[in-house]
Amino acid sequence: AADSFDYVRAQDVLEHVQDFFGVMEELHRVCRDGAEILVRMPFMSSLHFATDPTHRRAGTSATFDYFDPTRPLGRYAYSPARFERVSFHYGRFYPGKVGKLFKLIDRVLVPYCERNATSYEHYFAYVYPMHDVTYTLRAIKR
């Protein structure tokens, strides 16, 4: 039913759907105004994105800016669905001893990359790749 949900979690889902805009419009329809949507999907330079043949798309810091009327890409209005992009965070993970070393480095570099996302994504995304990106969105209905 329309306007039914205050919270939706779409973890490792949207990269698989064929009709991305249709799914976003359906999310918008079933969410109440101000509902929080948590989305996780593979980052564009992730080996996990490229390895899985069922992945249709990957995310960047700006993937959901097309739905946010307060952001420059929102002017394209590809869809009537509107969401505020509240936040995004890159995710990296490595197992074992190498993972412990990377975790120390990541404490500094990941927040730096998030603060400088456009430059990072243009110049360094394939040098220092993230695995996924997580977004917090808020449904806008007014």
Give short role names for the model-derived ranges.
Residues R9-H16:
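Short catalytic micro-motifs in class I SAM-dependent methyltransferases
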Residues Q18-G22, E26-H28, E36-R142:
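S-adenosyl-L-methionine-dependent methyltransferase catalytic module, highlighting the catalytic core
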